């Protein structure tokens, strides 16, 4: 909760503490009225109001002030977090490099479905509250953030490596291929690329950042777009291949998925180079995925 630049002068003309008329009128509101005005509606609070609420003789009003204080502190903390998240981007923006891209992947560990990647170029100065490593967010938070990211992006793109490519190349190489595809699908291409702890075979300079999806706004944004896209895809696959629970676990090796795999056997989108799928097929474990990561 922010305090607006509008202020109430809390001194009368000769310097004696006084309540301005508008502030006095506000403080005549009931606890419910004050809650509706400042807590439920999240309107900005003119400077001078919050201190008055803290000193109000009504316990309910003082409780509202506590809520507003916590909301203000949380907003300030989020602003500081977003500032830290744009450190890598600002290093390039400040040197005149406007097209700073970020790329990330999801779906490396599942037993079923493709690897999905997303690449994003955010507008200079973009600040999207709530962006974080997609794994740290709820499904509802990701679904709310993905449209905001796309709206504030200069461009964004999806890449994919199929189940067949995963089985043929190995999961690590397939992930690199999907990352490259997402980047090369961007238009315009980035002038500089931020990558989560690896290097990609693309024709532009890049900065690998360990845990980049939690340290870079652009990589975090890409991780959210990729996760939402893959989740929707796996829900579609659940309708096509019922019985495995793909819309719930998204292909990851949960007990429910492993039980369904043993009961039903693999379907077309199961990764046959992964050990649990091979065991369900009765194949020798020695022929399992050559190198997962």
Q: Where do the PLM segments sit?
A:
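RNase H-like, Mg2+-dependent phosphodiesterase core
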Residues: 1-101, 105-293
